[in-house]
Amino acid sequence: MEPRAVGVSKQDIREQIWGYMESQNLADFPRPVHHRIPNFKGSYLACQNIKDLDVFARTQEVKVDPDKPLEGVRLLVLQSKKTLLVPTPRLRTGLFNKITPPPGATKDILRKCATSQGVRNYSVPIGLDSRVLVDLVVVGSVAVSEKGWRIGKGEGYADLEYAMMVSMGAVSKETPVVTIVHDCQVVDIPEELVEEHDITVDYILTPTRVIATGCKRPKPMGITWFKISLEMMEKIPILRSLRAREQQAGKDVTLQGEHQHLPEPGCQQTVPLSVGRRPPDTPGPETNSMEAAPGSPPGEGAPLAADVYVGNLPGDARVSDLKRALRELGSVPLRLTWQGPRRRAFLHYPDSAAAQQAVSCLQGLRLGTDTLRVALARQQRDK
């Protein structure tokens, strides 16, 4: 007898599904399936059903979650020569990675590319400013109803990834969402458990069925900021970049537990320095020498309206390390003056507002193990 979702909470339903799959030996590696998107016996068979969907035939770019039961779909996407996008693990360094098999990849190589190891070894990151248009989204689930209500493992990453894709214009309300589950994971889910930030699904694929849910409930229209905690902001750098963008556009980006407007989201990011070193970047001519002047009084030595000082650079840092960090945090200047031997750089922004925002966003920025000093800059005579 298959489980019935009679619990009063999402967690009740999760526990029922996990327990049933283990007790009935329906689960597959990795086990136990508790606190996971459960892999199941027959997952590859269920994945094959996606070939029968017209929406799959029409797609070119497919975003597939990295969960084990979706491995068969990732392989089919690659075999069909479609673009395969996967979420960056735990969204630590971005939103998407593109799986790029080597030229002339054999079937065995494509199979490796579809695994979690392949995601690590054959992927390249896609930047926040990349023009990505996702045609189809494939997510894992712990439980799903024939009406299209979905329950994940409880961390909220699939819902957040979708909301972030909406925010960056990668998906629209017309983009179909597919989930792949065992038949026992298709259960009744009370609609009152479904929240506005929850992603719903349009198709459910099991080893024995293809279910078109006909779900009419609107999908999330973007990031629900008041559901985002400060802890999550610290864990996910790209959230800070998206928040800064939406705040600049005049949107309400108040976080969970906040009761007043914050000047700018603080940004802290550790950027690893490259292992293989090139010779140090040659410093350009220093026509103007600047020093940090946080809180200096107006008058002589007052901050320049649009210049930001970055100090305490690691001795072996390269300009490319800093540029990468600025891109990831959405604080790219008009021009960058690099003074590596003096362990500092200057960022030149179009106006004082952009410079102030950059100073706020870059507080706590790290390159390697060194925390950088970031402040508005003042012009001084070179000594």
Curated annotation (Swiss-Prot):
Q: Which UniProt keywords apply?
A: RNA-binding
- Name the segments for region: Disordered: 249-301
Question: PROSITE patterns, from UniProt?
Answer: RRM
**CC annotations in GO:** cytoplasm
According to the UniProt entry, its GO molecular function terms are: RNA binding
Domain RRM, chain residue ranges per copy? 306-379
- Tell me, what's a Pfam family for it? RRM_1
Extract the PANTHER family matched here. 5-FORMYLTETRAHYDROFOLATE CYCLO-LIGASE-RELATED, METHENYLTETRAHYDROFOLATE SYNTHASE DOMAIN-CONTAINING PROTEIN
Official protein name in the record:
Methenyltetrahydrofolate synthase domain-containing protein
The gene coding this protein: MTHFSD
